[in-house]
Structures are given as C-alpha cells and as structure tokens.
C-alpha cells in the first residue's frame, strides 16, 4: 500500500476516534471578488475549541496511548494548547517544552489545563530538541507536532469534511508549516478525489509573489 492510501485510511480511523471530541468546522465563502465562475471558501478551523486544527492530531495521537504513559512535546503555542486539552480530557500526564519568548496568552492557556511547562532558551527548534532529549531518558513518550502518522492522520480528517461540504472541489490551498497538515489533508483528498489539485503555501513563497501588508 502506498503512503497516500495508508494515510487516507488511517485518517478515516482517526475520524471515528475523535469525531465526538472536535467541531466539524464550517466553510465560509470569501468576500473577495474573483474571476467569474470561481468560488473561494475558507475552512474555519479557528472555531475549534483550542483555536486551531492542532486539536485533531493531538486527540488522534493521545487517545491511542496508555494513560500510564507520561507524555512530552514541544511547541510554540497551538500544538501545546491542543495536547494540553487532549491530555486533560484523557487523563494523561503531559509536559510541554516551550521557547522562553512564547506569547503570554498561549503560555497561560497551556498552564490552564494543568500541564507542566518547561521554558527553554532559544526558538521552537531548540525546544523540540530539548523535548526529544528528555524523551530519550525513557521517562516520557515524545509527541511530534507534525512528524507522526497519528498526528498527520488526525489533521487529515479535515479532508473528509472538505469533500462533504464542497463536492467536486477543484483546488485546495494548504499552509505547509511542518508538513503534517498538508500531508494529512492532501492524502485524504487525493485518495478520494484524484482530480483535485493540492497546492502548498508557505510564507516565503507568498512574499516572493505578493508584497507584505505590514512592514
């Protein structure tokens, strides 16, 4: 079985696992006036209970792990909030390693779930390195924000909703980031709707084609 088919089927399993714990978010039409015959929609994942799509992957992963297993992850905010919420719901012990300069609102949100926090000097990459090192001691199981099949499969559940909400969809534009979101959604959509195009979007590519709104 190829990787796209594997992820699509795993996302279907994840969908049943997390269905009652997430919001099936709506698609809103854009206010932009585009070429005639083109309809543009936005998937409102900001409506999720933790404010982002990350809750899908977090629940998909954590619900499969024994409650006796101590968990650790690294985050610049949204993944940490999602894992903290999921761990609170499932009764897991979770530690989140965050960059020292993480936003105050995200830090407070994570602590609000009773999660243990480690503030690490440097950026999110160094926070991830710290979390991996702590996991290597054997005390914790590490939860990657993006490089994990269960996480990717959870994010892929968005793909099923898109296909149901917007039948015969032509193109799907997905932010790339660490790759988990586009891998999950892309696998589901290409498996069930092979003619639909998947276009990855990154900040660097956007800035090459469009001037920044704010300097």
Model regions: which residues?
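PLP-dependent amino-acid enzyme catalytic core
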Residues: 1-215
């Amino acid at each position: 079985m190829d990787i796209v088919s594997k992820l699509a089927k795993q996302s279907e399993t994840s969908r049943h696992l997390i269905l009652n714990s997430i919001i099936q978010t709506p698609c809103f039409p854009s206010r932009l006036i585009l070429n005639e015959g083109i309809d543009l929609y936005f998937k409102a994942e900001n409506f999720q209970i933790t404010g982002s799509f990350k809750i899908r992957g977090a629940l998909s992963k954590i619900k499969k792990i024994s409650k006796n297993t101590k968990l650790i992850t690294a985050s610049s905010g949204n993944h940490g909030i999602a894992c903290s919420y999921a761990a609170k719901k499932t009764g897991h012990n979770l530690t989140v390693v965050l960059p020292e300069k993480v936003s105050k609102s995200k830090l407070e949100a994570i602590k609000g779930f009773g999660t243990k926090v480690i503030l690490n000097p440097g950026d999110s990459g160094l926070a991830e390195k710290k979390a991996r090192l702590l996991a290597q001691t054997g005390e914790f199981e590490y939860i990657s924000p993006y490089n994990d099949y269960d996480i990717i499969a959870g994010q892929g559940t968005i793909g099923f909703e898109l296909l149901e909400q917007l039948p015969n969809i032509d193109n799907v534009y997905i932010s790339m980031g660490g790759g988990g979101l586009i891998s999950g959604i892309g696998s589901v959509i290409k498996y069930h709707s092979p003619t639909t195009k998947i276009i990855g979007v990154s900040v660097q590519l956007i800035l090459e084609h469009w001037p920044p709104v704010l300097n």
